[in-house]
């Protein structure tokens, strides 16, 4: 059985207050002066002070083996802050730090370790505030108002580097080869790791490490680095430094899922919901010029327009990609929303998913068997449900303590307003009818004989995504649904958490004293007219799931207050994020893919045409991380997701999976 929780570091603090690993019998940093050693070995060994002002790109990427207490990262962040203050006009504006950690510290131990370096407190406190849950995979932390990005990969570095997507090849400008000493932790210091470092290293990239062990030097040379010895720090005689002086060939391991970016930095986004809003912010942070075209007269009039939506992860014992994506998307979303400098109604009150029948009870039992961190999800017995939710249900279930609800409409509107302050241009009442290649860009034809040309286009227009010749074959479908708005009652007012059953019920929004209950589900429909039948069904599902409780029967839908919307979904419940695939070319190029994988060319896609769609019913959870993934891909930057999970988000995945098995593919 796959476990979804990472073992925390087993450590103690010695007489000097230095953290010491019990498992490896080694200190996390020098008892003498760990801060100065970091500056000497890693910053000095990679010549970063001299390189920053001369760096020809807006982003500098550092990768590290062994995050530990974060001392190297915090020291580098401090130096980068000082560089930016001294060189405000420099080309280099953002720092990206990638680090791997098999046994992450707890937040409490991290804070204790950071007490050693009071001068790093301004940066350490930001790191502690965003410290992620012990879940496997990549955790992206956006720090210093987006000037610093930290990708924390939790797990074994030798396993993780083999799972990295090809988009990370040759992206790293400097390597910090750190960790417990080779004699203490030989499993980390392998030729596989050295080869992975070379694969990720940009030509001209450097590396530095505290050790001078011969097998480390020879292994790095074998991987392709030019190595030399340098005087070690303090009492250490020698250390190693290296340079990647050659351009090594690294063939794409899964070309059918290859992701193409763009160097054009100017884009049009089609849409007006949460996907468009969050992607706009992510691209603007990377220096893009962004124009948004919305078919409606205002934002969030489609699927993103609800008053309240639940935020919690979608988990399944039998789908690893689903678990990896949604658990990390959920924790990223919480960090992202908490730091977002806009106001929107929300309450992180928790979400409880209830087992109202045998099937749902079995599903919850399977989720609980996955060894999830208690901070993510925890079992709750029937007699405790009333205590934590405020209402009786006579059901047991699973609680997501960090979940809750937010107002999608308000979030979308205010994020777009923030993006406009940062340079976003918005055009409302622009219904895109078709698009075609023109010169080196895209010609957009809107209703009313309006036209525009843009270098790059992103389709983020929900269920209307398949309305163009380039996207008409996508295997997505529409789902119409109605959310009922119900007035609170004395009993309903006691509800303290979002309840999920064969539907959902939110606590009241103090702004309007109403609850949301929903939603009806009509696959293949785009109907947005109010339905009395749907209104009654929303109420009846609640009663059917909790037949023994009186408060459910008191729910009043007679006011006919509701909102109808249409979602875009896929049969595997995962979003579609990436290049728009060329359906006809895919069938031609991959006709013999099952027999000729070794001869496969890169996935056929439309150049500079991207999509961000099929968020289904979990867009509040998935949209922030998907926006970050797509913006990173478009900007040719490191993507915060492993290769197999990224493949599960690729818009061509449902076709390619069949072609890899030699099965026929049909459109839609």
From Swiss-Prot:
Q: What is this protein called?
A: tRNA 5-methylaminomethyl-2-thiouridine biosynthesis bifunctional protein MnmC
- State whether keyword Membrane applies: no
Q: Which InterPro entries match?
A: FAD-dep_OxRdtase (IPR006076), FAD/NAD-bd_sf (IPR036188), MnmC-like_methylTransf (IPR008471), SAM-dependent_MTases_sf (IPR029063), tRNA_MAMT_biosynth_bifunc_MnmC (IPR023032), tRNA_MNMC2 (IPR047785), tRNA_S-uridine_synth_MnmC_C (IPR017610)
Predominant location of this chain?
cytoplasm
Traced from the root, the source organism's taxonomic lineage reads:
Bacteria, Pseudomonadati, Pseudomonadota, Gammaproteobacteria, Enterobacterales
Q: Which HAMAP family match?
A: MnmC (MF_01102)
Q: Which GO terms describe its molecular function?
A: flavin adenine dinucleotide binding; oxidoreductase activity, acting on the CH-NH group of donors; tRNA (5-methylaminomethyl-2-thiouridylate)(34)-methyltransferase activity
Name the PANTHER family on file. SARCOSINE DEHYDROGENASE-RELATED, TRNA 5-METHYLAMINOMETHYL-2-THIOURIDINE BIOSYNTHESIS BIFUNCTIONAL PROTEIN MNMC
Cellular component terms (Gene Ontology): cytoplasm
**What domain of life?**
Bacteria
Subcellular location per the Swiss-Prot or TrEMBL entry = Cytoplasm
């Amino acid at each position: 059985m796959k476990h979804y929780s990472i073992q925390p570091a087993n450590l103690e603090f010695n007489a000097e207050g230095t953290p010491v690993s019990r498992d490896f019998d080694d200190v996390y940093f020098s008892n003498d002066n760990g801060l100065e050693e970091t500056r000497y070995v890693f910053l000095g060994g990679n010549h970063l002070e001299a390189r920053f002002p001369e760096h020809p790109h807006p982003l500098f990427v550092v990768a590290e083996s062994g995050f530990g207490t974060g001392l190297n990262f915090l020291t580098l962040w401090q130096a980068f802050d000082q560089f930016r203050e001294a060189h405000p006009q420099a080309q280099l504006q953002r720092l990206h730090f990638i680090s791997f950690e098999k046994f992450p510290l707890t937040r409490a131990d991290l804070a204790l370790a950071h007490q050693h370096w009071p001068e790093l407190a301004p940066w350490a406190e930001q790191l502690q505030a965003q410290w992620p849950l012990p879940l496997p995979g990549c955790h992206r932390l956006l720090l210093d108002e987006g000037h610093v990005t930290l990708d924390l990969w939790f797990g074994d570095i030798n396993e993780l580097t083999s799972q990295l997507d090809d988009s990370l090849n040759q992206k790293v400008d400097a390597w910090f080869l750190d960790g417990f000493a080779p004699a203490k932790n030989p499993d980390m210091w392998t030729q596989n790791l050295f080869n992975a470092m070379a694969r990720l290293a940009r030509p001209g990239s450097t590396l530095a490490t505290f050790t001078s062990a011969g097998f480390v030097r020879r292994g790095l040379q074998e991987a392709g680095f030019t190595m030399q010895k340098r005087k070690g720090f303090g009492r250490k005689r020698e250390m190693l430094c290296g340079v990647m002086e050659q351009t090594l060939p690294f063939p794409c391991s899964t070309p059918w899922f290859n992701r193409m970016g763009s160097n054009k930095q100017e884009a049009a986004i089609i849409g007006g919901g949460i996907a468009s809003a969050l992607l706009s912010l992510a691209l603007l942070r990377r220096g893009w010029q962004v124009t948004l075209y919305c078919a409606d007269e205002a934002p969030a009039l489609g699927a993103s327009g609800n008053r309240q939506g639940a935020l919690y992860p979608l988990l399944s014992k039998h789908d690893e990609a689903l678990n990896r994506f949604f658990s990390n998307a959920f924790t990223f979303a919480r960090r992202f929303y908490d730091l977002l400098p806009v106001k929107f109604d929300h309450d992180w009150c928790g979400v409880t998913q209830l087992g109202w029948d045998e099937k749902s009870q079995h599903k919850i039992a399977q989720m609980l068997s996955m060894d999830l961190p208690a901070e993510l999800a925890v079992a709750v017995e029937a007699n405790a449900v009333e205590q934590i939710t405020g209402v009786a249900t006579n059901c047991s279930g699973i609680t997501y303590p960090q979940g809750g609800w937010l107002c999608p409409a308000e979030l979308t509107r205010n994020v777009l307003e923030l993006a406009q302050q940062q340079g976003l241009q918005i055009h409302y009442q622009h219904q895109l009818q078709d698009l075609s290649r023109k010169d080196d860009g895209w010609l957009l034809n809107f209703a009313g004989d309006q036209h525009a040309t843009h270098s790059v286009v992103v389709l983020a227009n929900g269920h209307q995504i398949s309305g163009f010749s380039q996207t008409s074959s996508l295997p997505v479908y529409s789902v119409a649904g109605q959310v009922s708005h119900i007035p609170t009652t004395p009993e309903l007012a006691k509800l303290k958490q979002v309840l999920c059953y064969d539907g959902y019920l939110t606590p009241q929004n103090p702004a309007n004293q109403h609850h949301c209950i929903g939603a009806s589900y009509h696959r293949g429909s785009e109907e947005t007219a109010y339905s009395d039948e749907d209104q009654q069904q929303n109420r009846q599902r609640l009663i059917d799931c909790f037949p023994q409780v009186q408060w459910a029967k008191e729910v009043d839908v007679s006011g006919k207050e509701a909102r109808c919307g249409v979602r875009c979904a896929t049969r595997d419940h995962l979003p579609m994020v990436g290049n728009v695939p060329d359906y006809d070319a895919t069938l031609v190029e991959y006709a013999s893919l099952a027999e000729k994988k070794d001869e496969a060319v890169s996935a056929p896609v439309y150049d500079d045409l991207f999509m961000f769609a099929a968020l289904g019913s979990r867009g509040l959870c998935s949209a922030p991380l998907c926006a970050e993934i797509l913006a990173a891909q478009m900007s040719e930057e490191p993507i915060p997701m492993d290769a197999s999970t990224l493949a599960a988000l690729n818009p061509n995945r449902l076709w390619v999976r069949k072609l890899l098995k030699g099965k026929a593919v049909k459109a839609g």
